[in-house]
């Protein structure tokens, strides 16, 4: 094990990064105060919220591809239910699981949401779902292998798992180093290289169907915020804090000059970041990736 960033160590065998020491469950709960989730139904400032929803819902045709009419779909860590709402609009039976009521505020009423700190305690029957989505959640969990094993159990034979994570072996991660926005310490307990994630899925009874390296919602912003973090001239992750829709009491305490500089670098940086996102997609090294896997049998 070698140190890579504050509180983060990297396994020299598998390449996975993890917090050391691991926080206790009580400490983990403290990483997610109510304001982390934003106001009910929203997480970002209004114009960003509309953009996030627009881009996110463009993925729904991908998520619903090849599903039979009325198929049961589970979103692990469903949050505000953006994915579930769009899938419900397409006639699917949607389910979600979250760690707290605060996390799921604003979720679509058509979704059956279960509140459980661990997926294994949510009480789903074996083979119940045709598809399970775990979108930028696996890295937050203290037992990722156990969660993947539980997903395998509750999927029907031939059922599909779609999992998205930051790619710890990506060009963006290597260039950014400890300044990488997608590290998100200490909330991300694990950092997965793509090849290690695929190996984990294969070892738990899945076959890899496809991998995808392009994310307009995640990857360009990661370039901009990571570059600002590297410069150390502005608050760490300050741009994200500026765009986040927190309560008034919890708003980022930036003065006018700092806010203007953050907005300036957002406007200037996005075009180059989009180009870099295209490049990392071409070389199959997306800053965030999603993998489609199928349960054998």
Where are these regions (language model features)?
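Conserved N-terminal segment of class I S-adenosyl-L-methionine
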Residues: 1-135, 144-149, 213-214, 238-239, ...
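A C-terminal cap/extension of S-adenosyl-L-methionine-dependent methyltransferases
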Residues: 1-3, 215-297
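Short, glycine-/aromatic-enriched active-site segment of Class I SAM-dependent methyltransferases
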Residues: 163-191, 195-202, 214-218, 223-225
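A short hydrophobic/small-residue beta-strand
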Residues: 94, 161-162
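A short glycine-rich, Lys/Arg-flanked "PGG" loop and its adjoining helix->strand segment in the class I
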Residues: 145-160
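Short catalytic micro-motifs in class I SAM-dependent methyltransferases
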Residues: 135-142, 164
């Amino acid at each position: 094990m070698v140190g890579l960033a504050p509180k983060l160590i990297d396994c020299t065998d598998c390449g996975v990064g993890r917090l050391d020491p691991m926080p206790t469950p009580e400490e983990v709960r403290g990483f997610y105060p109510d304001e982390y989730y934003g106001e009910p139904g929203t997480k970002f400032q209004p114009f960003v919220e509309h953009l996030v929803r627009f881009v996110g819902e463009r993925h729904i045709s991908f998520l619903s591809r090849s599903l039979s009419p009325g198929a049961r779909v589970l979103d692990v860590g469903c949050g505000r239910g953006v994915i579930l709402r769009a899938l419900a609009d397409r006639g699917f039976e949607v389910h979600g699981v979250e760690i707290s009521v605060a996390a799921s505020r604003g979720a679509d009423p058509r979704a059956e949401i279960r509140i459980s700190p661990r997926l294994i305690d949510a009480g789903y029957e074996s083979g119940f779902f045709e598809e399970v989505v775990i979108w930028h959640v696996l890295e937050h969990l203290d037992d990722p292998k156990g969660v993947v094993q539980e997903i395998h159990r509750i999927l029907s034979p031939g059922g599909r798992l779609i999992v998205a994570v930051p790619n710890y072996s990506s060009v963006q991660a290597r260039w950014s180093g400890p300044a990488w926005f997608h590290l998100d310490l200490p909330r991300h307990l694990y950092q997965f290289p793509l090849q290690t994630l695929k190996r984990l899925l294969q070892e738990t009874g899945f076959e890899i169907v496809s991998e995808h390296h392009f994310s307009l919602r995640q990857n360009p912003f990661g370039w901009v915020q990571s570059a600002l973090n590297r410069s150390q001239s502005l608050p760490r992750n300050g741009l994200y804090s500026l765009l986040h829709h927190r309560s008034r009491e919890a708003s980022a305490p930036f003065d006018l000059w700092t806010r203007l500089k953050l907005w300036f670098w957002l406007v200037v940086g996005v075009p180059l970041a989009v180009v870099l996102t295209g490049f990392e997609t071409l070389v199959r090294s997306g800053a965030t990736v999603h993998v489609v896997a199928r349960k054998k049998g």
